[in-house]
Amino acid sequence: MTNIRKSHPLIKIINDAFIDLPAPSNISSWWNFGSLLGVCLAVQILTGLFLAMHYTSDTATAFNSVTHICRDVNYGWLLRYLHANGASMFFICLYLHVGRGLYYGSYTYTETWNVGIILLFAVMATAFMGYVLPWGQMSFWGATVITNLLFAIPYIGTDLVEWIWGGFSVDKATLT
């Protein structure tokens, strides 16, 4: 008698993808973090789109729009918490993914490793922009402290910071 997971047409697809996956037997759970990064990124994009439908970035109404999302939108509180905690999970998975690469010596593949480093910097820059733009007074602090690190660059640091800020100081709590 044949096993149902190998004979049933629908269960066979799941069996081939998850149970009898043609992968080496010595692969460990450390190799899941790339897939988890994809899941976290998809959750971030979807929840971010739904939150952006109700968010107002004006300094006078930003807090009211967040309370509207949490109170009046169906499962708005869940979207907000998934988005906030999903960002933390994304970076945890990202750092574990890099740590796995360091542990297994993936840095010897220089082209692949350099692409990963560029992606890491792009993710950090994107996260910085997401942190700085909408959050009110916390973004004043974040923008000032983090971008002031650029002042340490010799000769161009001052001009670079003023270019990023768009002037001599950060103007408002949000971009509007």
UniProtKB/Swiss-Prot annotation:
Heme b b562 binds at residue 83. GO terms for cellular component: mitochondrial inner membrane. It is a multi-pass membrane protein. The chain crosses the membrane at residues 33-53, 77-98, 113-133. Belongs to the cytochrome b family. The keyword Mitochondrion applies. It comes from the Eukaryota. It is found in: Mitochondrion inner membrane. GO terms for biological process: mitochondrial electron transport, ubiquinol to cytochrome c. InterPro entries: Cyt_b/b6_N, Cytb/b6-like_sf, Cytochrome_b_N_euk/bac, Di-haem_cyt_TM. The cytochrome bc1 complex contains 11 subunits: 3 respiratory subunits (MT-CYB, CYC1 and UQCRFS1), 2 core proteins (UQCRC1 and UQCRC2) and 6 low-molecular weight proteins (UQCRH/QCR6, UQCRB/QCR7, UQCRQ/QCR8, UQCR10/QCR9, UQCR11/QCR10 and a cleavage product of UQCRFS1). This cytochrome bc1 complex then forms a dimer. Heme b b566 binds at residue 97. Binds 2 heme b groups non-covalently. Pfam families: Cytochrome_B (PF00033). GO terms for molecular function: metal ion binding; ubiquinol-cytochrome-c reductase activity. This is Cytochrome b. Its cofactor is heme b. Keywords: Electron transport, Heme, Iron, Membrane, Metal-binding, Mitochondrion, Mitochondrion inner membrane, Respiratory chain, Transmembrane, Transmembrane helix, Transport, Ubiquinone. Component of the ubiquinol-cytochrome c reductase complex (complex III or cytochrome b-c1 complex) that is part of the mitochondrial respiratory chain. The b-c1 complex mediates electron transfer from ubiquinol to cytochrome c. Contributes to the generation of a proton gradient across the mitochondrial membrane that is then used for ATP synthesis. Heme 1 (or BL or b562) is low-potential and absorbs at about 562 nm, and heme 2 (or BH or b566) is high-potential and absorbs at about 566 nm.
